[in-house]
Amino acid sequence: MKIIYAPCVLFCVLLTSGSGAAQSPAARTAERMRELIRVLDLKVLPKESGYLGIVGVSPQKVVVHGKPLAVQSQNYYMLTDTLPINYLHWLEPADTHILIEGGPVDYFIFHPDGQVEKIVLGMNVAKGERPIVAVPGGCWKALQLHKDARYALMANALSPEFTPDRVRIGEGAAWVKRFAGKAEWATPEFLRVMIGPNWKP
């Protein structure tokens, strides 16, 4: 009897393990991440990195530099363990990020007056994390997913709406010199990492 049924037992075990009936937490997280990317139609964002999904713009308008723009534009944005950094960029509009799921994320803000901030975008408010980060217009910023996180899905609202002519991606040596040493984490090496592939010689 043992010889007859052993192959059947082995076959059933293999079927069960391959069917996803007993998925590990890591497998469930990876599946959830893929589901969000698919359902929300997120696409890899060139230069800045991460995944972006356009939601829309508000019907209200405001005039900026002589052009009518929507008061606000809204997007989904995601970082993953394979695309963990939103590389340094400057935005003219104000930008607000709201954590929907996952994280936490380190949020680095560089103000035009030379001040710097590091805010942890996350749900553990008892540890100082914040589920919303609001960045004034005219700042540089970069985001980095925590190493123990698989992904972070965020909503972001830009006011007035985002347009490609009001963003600058990357910086160079003069920018690094300007902000290096403004905080313990703001080393030249780390700032260079946050600029990433968009280094301007």
Locations of regions flagged by a protein language model:
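Non-catalytic, conserved peripheral segments adjacent to functional cores
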Residues: S24-V133, A142-L143, A149-R150, P160-T163, ...
